Regions:
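Extended, charge-rich helix/loop segments that form flexible
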Residues: 121-188, 254-255
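Active-site-proximal alpha-helix that buttresses catalytic centers in soluble enzyme cores
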Residues: 2-91, 95-97, 115-119, 195-202
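Conserved alpha/beta-hydrolase "nucleophile elbow" surrounding the catalytic nucleophile
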Residues: 71, 229-230
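Acidic, low-complexity terminal tails and accessory targeting/binding regions
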Residues: 1-10, 19, 23, 28, ...
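Active-site metal-binding loops of divalent metal-dependent hydrolases
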Residues: 16, 230-231
Length: 267
C-alpha cells in the first residue's frame, strides 16, 4: 500500500516540523492541544531546514502536479521544497481542501484562508492556485472546515457555526477554535471529525486523483506530489482500513510519516 521512497507515481509528503510539534514531542502534554494561538502554526527553524533539505530529492524529479493542504505549515513546506526546482516557473500548486489535517485539536484548524491566500498565491516564489476553494466554498472559504465536523450533533453544529461566523467577522478565529476544542473535552466528544470521515476524505481524494490523472497514471517518469499531514497520510496508506467496519482509532498498518518524509502511496 505504501513505501518510504520516491519510486511511485503519487508521493505524499508530511509538512516540516512546527513549534507545536516540538513542544508536544518534548512534553507529551495535552494542555497544548487547547491553546488557540497554536491554530494554523507555521514551521519552526528546524522545519524550514527540513523542507530545504528535501529540495535535493525533489529537484531531480519531473513534476506533473502538486496538491497542497491549505494550512500554513503545509503551504510553507511546499514553498520551501519547490522554490529552487529547475522547473518551478511551470509548477502550479493546487491548494486542495480535502487534504487538510484531521480536525480534532486547535493545531488542526486554519485561522484565515483569506490571509493564507495573501501570502501564498500566483505571485509567490512558487505559484499557488486556490481555484478549488473558490469554486467549492465561494464566500465561505474561511469556514470550509465546519463541514468536516461530523461528530457534532445538529444543535452543537448550528451553535458553533454562528460562533465561527462571528469570529470570522471579528478576526477572532483562534478564540472560537479554542472554545470548540475545550467544548469537545468538557462534553466527552471523542474527536471533532470522525475517523470514518477522514477515511472517506482520503478515499474521495484518491478517486479524484485516479480520474484526474487517468491518462498518465502509469507514467512514473513524472510525479504527483501531495503536501499534507500525518493524520491524512495515516488513512491514505492503510490497506486493512478498506475492509474495516468500525472506525475508532488509527489503522494499525498505517504509515506514521516523519516531517518532510516522502511516502510512495498506491492509489
Amino acid at each position: 500500500m505504501f513505501e518510504k521512497n520516491l519510486n511511485g507515481k503519487f508521493l505524499f509528503v508530511r509538512h516540516g516540523l512546527t513549534e507545536f510539534n516540538k513542544i508536544q514531542n518534548e512534553t507529551h502534554s495535552e494542555s497544548i492541544e487547547f491553546i488557540g494561538e497554536y491554530s494554523d502554526a507555521v514551521l519552526s527553524q528546524e522545519g524550514i531546514a527540513q523542507a530545504i533539505n528535501a529540495q535535493k530529492f525533489i529537484n531531480n524529479i519531473k513534476i506533473e502536479k502538486v496538491y497542497c493542504s491549505p494550512l500554513k505549515r503545509a503551504l510553507e513546506t511546499c514553498l520551501k521544497i519547490f522554490e529552487s526546482h529547475p522547473n518551478k516557473d511551470n509548477i502550479i500548486i493546487e491548494v486542495f481542501p480535502l487534504v487538510t489535517e484531521f480536525l480534532n485539536i486547535c493545531y488542526d484548524f486554519p485561522n484565515s484562508i483569506e490571509e493564507n491566500k495573501k501570502i501564498y498565491n500566483m505571485n509567490s516564489k512558487v505559484k499557488f492556485n486556490w481555484k478549488s476553494f473558490e469554486e467549492i466554498f465561494g464566500e465561505k472559504q474561511n469556514l470550509f472546515f465546519l463541514s468536516y465536523l461530523d461528530n457534532l450533533n445538529e444543535e452543537e453544529y448550528n451553535k458553533f457555526y454562528k460562533i465561527f461566523e462571528e469570529a470570522n467577522k471579528n478576526k477572532t478565529m483562534d478564540k472560537a477554535i479554542e472554545e470548540l476544542v475545550k467544548y469537545k473535552k468538557e462534553n466527552n466528544i471523542s474527536t471533532l471529525e470522525s475517523y470514518k470521515h477522514i477515511f472517506n476524505r482520503t478515499q474521495e481524494f484518491k478517486k479524484y486523483l485516479k480520474e484526474k490523472h487517468i491518462g498518465s497514471i502509469d507514467d512514473l517518469s513524472q510525479k504527483i506530489i501531495i503536501v499534507t499531514h500525518g493524520g491524512f497520510i495515516k488513512f491514505s496508506t492503510s490497506k486493512s482500513v478498506l475492509n474495516q467496519k468500525a472506525f475508532n482509532d488509527w489503522p494499525k498498518d498505517c504509515c506514521f510519516a516523519d516531517n518532510c518524509e516522502f511516502i510512495s502511496v498506491n492509489i
